[in-house]
Amino acid sequence: TPSNSSAASDVYKRQVLSAIDEVDGPFAVINADDYYGRHAFEAIYNYLSEHEDDDRYRYAMVGYLLKNTVTDNGHVARGICTTNEEGELVNITERTRIEKRDGKIAFTENDGETWENLPEDTLVSMNMWGFTRSILDELKAEFPQFLKKGLTENPMKCEYFLPAVVSNLLEADRATAAVLPSTDKWYGVTYKEDKPVVVEAIRNLKKEGLYPENLWEE
C-alpha cells in the first residue's frame, strides 16, 4: 500500500483539502521544495488530459529511477514502488535508509549491520501525484473521523496522510494509480552539502535553454 512517510507526504492531506473550494478539475500534487523535471509535469498533464474517472477513480503517480534521487552526502528514505502488469501501483515499501556504498545503491533495515543492494532503475515515489477532483471528496469524507481519532490519541502531532487515502481506495478496488516512469533527475536539498549541487544543476538547465533566467518573466 502507498507509504505514509516518504518525503513530505505527512502534510499533504490538510494542504490539499484546504484548496477544495478552488479546485474544479484534475490537478497534481508535489513537494513545494523539490525539483521534479520537465518530463514529469508533461507525463502528469498528458495522463490527466487523457483519463477520466469511470467505474473507478483514475489517478497517477510519477515513478523516478532510484539512481536519479540519491545523494552523495548521506542516506535517504525512499518509497519503493511495486506495480502490476498494467503498470499500476500495487504498493509502496518504505526504505528509510538508502545510500551509495562501494559504487552501488543499498538499503539497511538493521542500522547498518547488513545491507541489500537495490537495482539503480528501481522505481521510487517522490510524491508527485495526479488526481481527478474525486480525491477531494474522499479527503473531505474521511476528515471528521481523522479529527475524532487524532485529536483524542495524539492531539499535538496527529497528521492526515494523503497516501493513506490512496491506499484505502486501491485496496477497495475503487481506484487505480498509474505509475508514470520518468528518467528526469530529481533534485532536493536533503543535506546542506546538496545545495551547491542543486544550484549548479538549475544554473546549467538555464544555460541549456530549458528554463528562462527569470522563470516568471512574461
Question: What residue spans do the PLM features occupy?
Answer:
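Single conserved hydrophobic/aromatic residue that forms the stacking wall/gate
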Residues: T1-A8, Y12
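Active-site nucleotide-sugar/metal-binding loop of Leloir-type enzymes
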Residues: V16-P26
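Short beta-strand-to-loop acidic/aromatic patch adjacent to the donor-nucleotide binding site
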Residues: P26-Y35
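Conserved core of the sugar-phosphate nucleotidyltransferase
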Residues: R38-M128, R133
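Conserved active-site beta-strand element of glycosyltransferases/polysaccharide synthases
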Residues: G130, A177-L180, G188
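A C-terminal functional module that forms or caps the active site or interfaces directly
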Residues: L139-R174
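Terminal low-complexity segments of carbohydrate-biosynthetic enzymes
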Residues: E200, N204-E218
